[in-house]
Amino acid sequence: MGATGRPRSQAAHDAILKAALRLVAKRGFRAVSVNEIAAEAGVGKMTLYRHWPNKATVVMDSLLKLIGNETAFPEADSALESLRLQLHLQAAFFRSSRGNLIRSLVSEAQSDPELAAAFRDRWLNPRREGVRQNIQAAISEGSLRGDFNIDTAIDQLYGSLYYRLLLGSGAINEQFIEDTYQQFLAGHKARLSVRR
């Protein structure tokens, strides 16, 4: 009996994710309700609440499912090269229509504590942890110095992308990414020791 219930549950789960993304992309986070997501998915509101505690978490999970591994750190010859490639992937994502969805969610999160928490927990913190691990690997490889604050370095690298995404202050193009990466290296790359 449990085996027949599981596929139905998975189908409902997937339908809810698709409905949430479709509605939010079309109308914006604030304009969509849990009831509308459930109705669009063809499920009851309680079915939605069995999977997620609130609208913010279902919307974030729908976004994450859409993205998949699109902005994950790629395999490369070194941690630094993986970091450089991932910056380019993140920039391409922000330039896409999905970047507009991130911009909208960050904007809405300023006045919605549940969305702000879901955005941090499901989007921002896992990505920061991936960058942190990558930078630590580059330090272990001897490519980067180990005497800097990694969280500040993450903000320097990725904060500029979010700044341009949110404020439209400039293009998030390949040249901008290379400049950002090179400036990061200029301040953090390991140097040969100098004789005294």
Functional labels for PLM-detected ranges:
Residues M1-G2, L85, L89-A92, E129, ...:
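C-terminal peripheral helix-coil segments that are non-catalytic and often amphipathic
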Residues M1-R27, A31-E40, M46, T57:
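Basic, helix-initiating cap at the start of DNA-binding domains
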Residues Y49-W52:
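A short His-aromatic
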Residues N54, E108-P113:
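Short loop-to-helix capping motifs
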Residues T57-L66:
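Alpha-helical DNA-contacting segments of helix-turn-helix folds
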Residues T71-N100:
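Hydrophobic alpha-helical connector segments
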Residues A92, S96-N100, S104, E114-E141:
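Amphipathic alpha-helical packing segments from all-alpha helical-bundle domains
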Residues A118-W123, S140-D155, E174:
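All-alpha amphipathic helical-bundle segments outside canonical DNA-binding/catalytic cores
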